[in-house]
Amino acid sequence: MGRMAHRSHTGTGPSQRQLRVGELIRRTLADVLNRGEIHDPDLNRMSITVGEVRCSPDLKVATVHVMPLGGKDVEEAIALLSKHRGELRHHITRQMTLKYAPDLRFRPDETFDRLDETRRLFSDETVQRDIRGSGDGDED
């Protein structure tokens, strides 16, 4: 029990700490962007949603998934956020006590695209037939 009790997280998913830090970073960035605390008129005119933040196991890299309202100008939003990455990191370190300020990497949030694809799959006639067929209880 001694060796196994101190084993680090080796599962396929993120650890609780990664999830907790990612959520704190997400909230902090969303608040900063919502209040317009970054001094760039082009960035402040955009309404950007911070959908998810995924942290590396060592918490030194945070991948921030963002989407402008309406889904337009995604590349411009990512370029502007990347341009102000240092200022955004500064806001994060003021709000959180971490040993290292994570390097922020911005990516488009594809959650809604995946949701649309899932809906499309479930509405497919073949899938509907399989779903109805599996709920009959005819299996022996």
Swiss-Prot record:
Gene: rbfA
Pfam families the record matches: RBFA
UniProt lineage: Bacteria, Pseudomonadati, Pseudomonadota, Alphaproteobacteria, Rhodobacterales
TM region(s), chain numbering: none
Family per similarity comment: Belongs to the RbfA family.
Keyword set, alphabetical order: Cytoplasm, Ribosome biogenesis
Single GO term (MF): ribosomal small subunit binding
Keyword field contains Nucleotide-binding: no
Record flagged with keyword Cytoplasm: yes
Subunit record text: Monomer. Binds 30S ribosomal subunits, but not 50S ribosomal subunits or 70S ribosomes.
InterPro entries associated with the record: KH_dom-like_a/b, RbfA, RbfA_dom_sf, Ribosome-bd_factorA_CS
Family annotation (NCBIfam families): PRK00521.2-5
Functional summary from the UniProt entry: One of several proteins that assist in the late maturation steps of the functional core of the 30S ribosomal subunit. Associates with free 30S ribosomal subunits (but not with 30S subunits that are part of 70S ribosomes or polysomes). Required for efficient processing of 16S rRNA. May interact with the 5'-terminal helix region of 16S rRNA.
UniProt main location, coarse: cytoplasm
Subcellular location as annotated: Cytoplasm
GO biological process, one term: maturation of SSU-rRNA
Protein name: Ribosome-binding factor A
Disulfide bond annotation, renumbered to this chain: none
Domain of life: Bacteria
Gene Ontology cellular-component annotations: cytosol
Annotated PROSITE patterns: RBFA
